[in-house]
A protein has these predicted regions:
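Single conserved hydrophobic/aromatic residue that forms the stacking wall/gate
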Residues: 126-135
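Chalcogenol-based redox active-site neighborhoods
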Residues: 1-127
Length: 135
């Protein structure tokens, strides 16, 4: 069953381009926007991640942290971030989880458990309260 409004989000640790990330440790007492994207180097995802980077200072003023994921590797993320920064005139410095094993995507319902092993995560967004509940 997928996560629903009001559910406590499960904690996880996963690799990112910034090193290992533990969700609860990363979140602390902040709100968190966790969003997934299907794949690195896609035009729509490039503009979305660039826009999140541009808005991030405003979100931080409101105690909101951002984190994203895809089933690509941390090395792929690092290369793609250079493209995002160049084409979107911004600096992506928030974590992009490298969910190549699909563990977090499946845990959060971003990929159906019976989906093909080649299927990527769908675009999905969770806004989580400081209490770790989905709103």
């Amino acid at each position: 069953m997928s996560l629903q409004l009001g559910d406590v989000v499960p904690d996880f640790s996963q690799a990112s381009q910034l090193g290992p990330i533990n969700l609860y440790g990363f979140a602390g007492d902040s709100w968190v926007v966790l969003f997934s994207h299907p794949a690195d180097y896609t035009p729509v995802c490039t503009t979305e991640l660039g826009e999140v980077a541009r808005l991030r200072p405003e979100w931080e003023k409101r105690n909101v942290k951002t984190i994203t994921l895809s089933v690509d590797t941390a090395e792929s993320h690092k290369g793609w971030i250079g493209d995002i920064n160049e084409t979107q005139h911004t600096t992506v410095d928030y974590p992009i989880l490298a969910d190549a094993d699909r563990r977090v995507s499946e845990l959060y319902g971003f990929i159906h458990p019976n989906a093909s092993s080649t299927l990527t995560a769908v675009s999905y967004t969770h806004l989580t309260l400081p209490t770790k509940r989905i709103v």
